[in-house]
Design a protein with these regions (language model features):
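Long, contiguous binding/interaction regions
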Residues: 1-121
Length: 121
């Protein structure tokens, strides 16, 4: 038997407004890529998003990632329209996000791994 382990990963998307095109999304993704953020600019239907895997969410979590996307997007004349947490995050990661930003960032206690484990018991 072989068992592998990795640190937690948070899948997170920033959807851009209707003015944004795929070139904008790809430019933003390239600009924010780092050892902590894997990012792609994607076309989903008729909208574009910056799709991210936050591989060190205790260093760069949804709050920091969305801020980076917003800064680069604004320089290109587009805006982040909404944010999307894909799956769950840990309470440790959630605790680093200011309470007043959580709704905008699509995060809440009921979207944590710990909450889901608790309600199953």
């Amino acid at each position: 038997v072989c068992v592998g382990a990795r640190d937690q990963l948070v899948a997170y998307n920033c959807w851009l407004d209707e003015r944004a095109g795929i070139d904008d999304a790809r430019h933003i993704a390239r600009a924010i890529r780092s050892t902590e953020i894997r990012a792609l600019g994607l076309m989903v239907g008729d909208r574009v998003q910056v799709s991210m895997n936050l591989v060190s969410p205790m260093v760069v979590g949804p709050f920091e990632a969305e801020r980076l996307v917003t800064e680069v997007a604004e320089r290109r004349g587009v805006m982040v329209e909404r944010n999307e947490l894909v799956g769950l995050l840990s309470r440790d990661v959630l605790s680093r996000i200011p309470t007043e930003s959580r709704r905008r960032l699509d995060v809440a206690d009921d979207r944590t791994i710990e909450y889901r484990v608790e309600i199953r018991q």
